[in-house]
Amino acid sequence: MKIPQRTRGYLAIVIAAVLFGVWPSLSKRVLTEVHPFVVALLIQLVPAIALSPSLRRLRIARSDWPLLALSGVVGAVAAPIVYFYGLERTTASNSVLLSNSEALFTILFAYAFLGERATPREYLALGGIAVGAFLVTTQLRFGDVQFLGFLIGNLMLVGAAVCWGTSNTASAVLLRRIPIFPLLEVQLIFGTVSFAVLVPLSGAPLAVPSDILPDLLLLAASAVGMFSVLFFYAFRTIGAMRTGAILPTSALWGILAAFYFFPNETLSVVQVVGGALMVGSLVVFYLFRGPTETRAAGETLKPEASDGPDSP
């Protein structure tokens, strides 16, 4: 039985949300031993090497280069710098919460610049996902989520979310004409080359402790490489707005990842309720999804690319 393309798109973003949820915990562990610039370099270098064959016979229109440069510089250079330095200056719970703001900016930019719209029922389900993510990440214990005490770090995480939201919007447009793998590879090259220059200028040591290396490789392969491919595939099949709407479910997986890496932590009743609300809202969002054919009202982002909708 063949799985419909739209269903594959929803499955892709759900899996991507799991990987995205693991990102803060893995990053926090790695940053305890490795300089932020070195982390940003290596987690982009590894998938860039793996995806390098995709550049063969790639042709990019001259008119696409400004947008491609914007997505690469903002998403692969500026965002990692702001994010990793912000992550060092805030708590793990804050980082899980504020990572969801990338989805918010992706949705807002899709609405404002891509002309994407959702149905009233989808907006309702989207609200349920947002509320569930809020419950999971805060547990309604606002004294523990120290926003004021970690204001600079929190603001930096929000700034990184704006950068990634901008890059996502640019990528959504580019994916209409450029296949997923080559687009991601070019963006990773922007990041790799930039940090290859910044690392020696900053004097950061390149040495990575052997006990941290597995976490770093896992971060590069899953939270950067696999996540980006699945994320872009969802962009092309269900649109940027719906992709951004489902991404906040990463908060649930983020809490579970934190529980795995830090076994002394436990899940509260509020978190269980929030997780159930997110999963239920996700099911509702899929069941009541609106039309997305080429003539669907108000939506402009379509899965059109030079290699067809099913090819990466």
What residue ranges belong to the model's regions?
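Juxtamembrane helix-entry segments on the extracytoplasmic side of multipass membrane proteins
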Residues: 5-9, 33-37, 41, 60-66, ...
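Specific transmembrane alpha-helical segments of multi-pass solute transporters/efflux pumps
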Residues: 19-26, 55-99, 133-135, 220-238
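Cytoplasmic-side transmembrane-helix entry/capping segments in multi-pass membrane proteins
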Residues: 13, 64-73, 118-130, 178-187, ...
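Glycine-/small-residue-enriched transmembrane alpha-helix faces in small-molecule transporters
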Residues: 1-38, 43, 144-173, 256, ...
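Helix-helix packing/entry segments at the starts of transmembrane helices
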Residues: 39-42, 80, 95-101, 170-192, ...
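Hydrophobic transmembrane alpha-helices of multi-pass small-molecule transport proteins
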Residues: 46, 51, 69, 109, ...
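Transmembrane alpha-helices of multi-pass small-molecule transport proteins
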Residues: 32-78, 105, 163-167, 184-203, ...
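Hydrophobic/aromatic residues within transmembrane alpha-helices
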Residues: 30, 39, 86, 112-114, ...
